[in-house]
Amino acid sequence: MRKNSGFTLIELMIVVAIIAIIAAIAIPNLLSARLNANETAAVATLRNISSAQAQFQATSKADMDRDGTGGFGSFRELSGDSAVRAGHPQAAGLLNPPVLSGAFRTPNANGEVSRSGYFFQIWLPDGNGYGVCPDGGAPFTTVNADIVETTWVCYAWPVNYGNSGNRTFMVNQTGDVVTTESNLYTGTGLMTGGTMPPHSAFINGANNSITGLTAVGTNG
C-alpha cells in the first residue's frame, strides 16, 4: 500500500511541462484576440467620429465665413470641452449637447486621444490644404474657412505596435475607413521612439495636402 506523500520530482516536471505547453498555445492566441479587439474598436471609433463630424457640420455652428455652410470640428469642439470657434453668431459657447463622447475632451499636447490601445488625431485644412491640429495647439485662424467645410481627416494608430495593434486606420469626409499594416506608426511623438502618421499619410499626391484622394493600402 502506497503511503500518503507529495508529488515526486518526475510528476512535478510533467505538470510543469504540461503548463508550459498550454501557455505556449494560449498566450499567442490571447494576444491575437486582444489585437483584433483593439483594431475592431478603433474602426468603430472612427465611424463614430465620422458620424459626429457630419452632425456637427449640419448644425453650421462652425461657419467661420458665415456663408451658411458649417465646417468640421476638433475633438474639443465635438465633445463639448471647448467653445466652438468664432464665426457663427450662435457659436459663443460649448456645443450642447455634444456629438462625441466626453472621453475625447482631454487630448495630449499633440492633440492625440488614447482609447483601447490606439491613438486618434483629427487634422483640419489650412489655406494650402495642409493639415493643422487645433487640439494640439494650432490656432483656428490657421484653418481655412472654405476648405474646412468639405475636408477633414482622422487617423488611428497603435499605442504600441505589435502589442496593442498592428494596423493604422484613417477616415475622412467620405466616411470610408481605410487601413494599412505598417510598423511605421506607433506611440506618440511625445515619447522617445514614437512616430505618429503625418497629416497626409494616406493621401495621394506629392503636395502633402489632405484634400487629395485616399491612397488605399499605402504606408504613408
Per-range role (PLM):
Residues N172-P197:
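A short, surface-exposed interaction/processing loop segment used at functional sites
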Residues A24, E39, Q55:
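Functionally critical, cavity-lining and gating residues within the transmembrane helices
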Residues R2-L30:
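N-terminal single-pass transmembrane signal-anchor helix
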Residues S51-T174, E181, I203-N219:
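Extracellular/periplasmic head regions of type IV pilus-like filament subunits
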